[in-house]
Amino acid sequence: MSKVICSPGCYIQGNGELKKLAEYCAMAGAKKAYLLVDKFIYDTYKSEIESSFKTDCFKYTMEIFGGECSEHEIHKHQNALGQSDIVIGIGGGKTLDTAKAVSFYSNIPVIIVPTAAST
């Protein structure tokens, strides 16, 4: 029996995809990205993530996730969006849930980059 999954709209997996984040933002029609990343990702992959946006001269803001998906955390990142027109969540489940909520309540697209097999 065949199963069809219609979500997400686009699924990309592969080596070196972090280097293409700005390209994927542009494909979504975005001009400025708001990146929400967990501390481990920030400490480990910050330069790799930034290089994607610097190469394509794409505007972005990167913020570290506070650790809990809460109303306070969602509002904090909504208020920090500024002119960003896409949210990118990079990390584990709580980081991605917060990024999706910020996106939903701000009515802008989201890209999620799971870093754990469970998400």
Segments the model singles out, each with a brief description of its role:
Residues 1-86:
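ATP/NTP phosphate-donor binding region
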Residues 69-119:
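Glycine/threonine-rich beta-strand-loop-alpha-helix active-site module
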